[in-house]
From Swiss-Prot:
Family: Belongs to the glycosyl hydrolase 13 family. Sucrose phosphorylase subfamily.
SMART domains referenced in this protein's UniProt entry, alphabetically: Aamy
Protein name as annotated: Sucrose phosphorylase
Keywords on record: Glycosyltransferase, Plasmid, Transferase
Species, as recorded: Agrobacterium vitis (Rhizobium vitis)
GO molecular function, one term: sucrose phosphorylase activity
Active site: 193, 233
Amino acid sequence: MKNSVQLITYVDRLSGGGFPELRALLDGRLQGLFGGVHALPFFNPIDGADAGFDPTDHTIVDPRLGSWDDVRALAGSVEIMADLIVNHVSAQSSWFQDFIAKGSDSEFADMFMTFGKAFPRGASEQDLLNIYRPRLGCRFQRPRLQIGSQRMLWTTFTPQQIDIDVHSAHGALYLETILDRFAEANVTAIRLDAAGYAIKKAGTSCFMIDETYAFLAKLAEKARDRGMEVLVEIHSYYRDQIEIASKVDRVYDFALPPLILHSLFTGDATALARWLEISPHNAITVLDTHDGIGVIDVGAHSDGRPGLLEPQAIDHLVEEIHRRSEGQSRLATGAAASNLDLYQVNCTYYDALGRNDDDYLIARAIQFFAPGIPQVYYVGLLGGINDMELLGKTGVGRDINRHFYEDREIDLALESPLVKRLSDLIRFRNTHPAFNGSFEVATDDTGSLVLSWNLNTEFAQLVVSFSQGKATITASGCYDFTFSGAIA
């Protein structure tokens, strides 16, 4: 994976079309900004129950976006990351519909995770309470088969997303078939979506248990055999992230976004500096994604071990996002929106900072200086604001940060002072040789955060005074960049 900034985007929501249009945009108005693209699910269909994360067929490109030839053509310009949705398939998939029609006589009957597979002797109330689930509601569904019987099936996320038994013959073959298709299209990295929920075992939380680590290691090996790196997507306790990072190619730094907000809101960089001292260097760093802003990643463990932030600090963080977004994030979070996520605040990162340009650039500068490969979400690239109209149409909280851009909007955004300055930061991160060297984090006598990269005679340094709302970048090659935001 190139050590350069990557773009995260839905193919159609940024380009207004398919893969050919996205390629034209990257080769045109966005030329030189991104070394790679995480193309969010482009499988058939892209407009299912979960915005592409519930494909009926993971091996088919939605024809509205193009074909695998178009994916391969884009791979000739930039590295491509694609999602391998590990945990589930659509209830509308041909495999599940065959199971509905034929029951145990279906050749795909073993592909789906039933209650009985995990609990062959039944489950106590405590067994069920132990199961970790990120959303409200029942984790099981009881569809009626056409032959008249019912089966209790795992549905970790929604009733439309049926969990796979990844150890079954058809489940394993399904995942390997997707890997083969990715490799044929020259995909260079895969993101294992919802991987932490893949293994179910009685007496456990059924989330990131020992057997999950073993499964991920084997799946990652299969991907590497096909020439692809592996990124694991898991929202979890920060120590778990460090452990996961030692076993895979890449892991998300999901603690970074809330810690930066906390520092900007309070003027205190202590927690952020402590995290940057121990955070995995093989990380993918983000501020925003297609999901909300996570808080579980900085919280305490369920067994009581302390997190990166105290509970009251997390409460303040969430309330401050709601305040700075003028209540819009509250309308998109928790009980106010469907697809409930218990650990995320739905809001654009720009709105979470009260649309303060300098605070936003300070946050991006910290991200670009943090260890790892930075990814920038398409809405964040354009300084996007909360899409209240889309939220109102769908009632899905995360749609507040999933805007459909028109060409004119993109042109206007690219001409804005904010996006021009952000583009300068991206180009600096992509081209300065110091970012291929060694990283150091410190705090100076004034409490400012100091992030440094050094490679032989090349250097780049970011100094952020959160108490003054000011940041300065100095680097070899006469680079100098100063910006001041709102004082907390």
